Amino acid sequence: TFDELSEEVQKEIIERERWNIMDQCMEAYGSDYVTSLRTFEKLTNTQSCSWSVNYSGYNFNFKYNNNPIFECPIDCSNDIYAEELCGKLLFRYINNNIMPYITQGRYYSSSGKYINEKYTYKYRRSRIIKSVGDDCPLTGMCYDFYLLEPIIKYYKTWCSYPDNFSLTDLIEQCYDSFFKCWHEEYEYWANDENAIREELHNNQYEDRLYYMDGRVYSGPLDDVA
């Protein structure tokens, strides 16, 4: 097994297998990234396009499904476009159209006690006090956080942003945060020796065996003493 090999041979295998491990891991996690991405698109009424992400880097574009954001029924010259939605209008837009879908009531729980020989406790979520950013509300996966972090940061500190900071700027930050995270996970699985070792350690329990010189054993397992 990998663990039984010499340190020198282990390092040779790590160098040889790093790209294969990266590809395998990112193929497994890629669908989770895409699920978070599609859910975010639906939430923000945007669509990512012409995007790519890999070990070398990432790039993306996005567009709005509906732009202008607000249409004036009387005079179209008063329509408000995403790149014009700034300041208090932007905060109100986020507060009314985004935050209700990514927040929930703050969680409260009693310390618990024995009742009828069973340990029980009471819990509830507040209908008044909201909790922001405590979990991953889009899909339940950690990648939600990287999409929503810029929005949550803006919501908490919007007064500190420039007056011309727009919805377009904010959504671009969200996509950039997300694709940067995705790219960095590629780097992690290719560059982090401890992560590669762990994968190789786990693979030995999936019948991945080696000769002493590091070559992969491909014979029948019945022949292994």
Locate predicted features.
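Alpha-helical propensity feature that highlights long, continuous alpha-helices across diverse contexts
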Residues: T1-A225
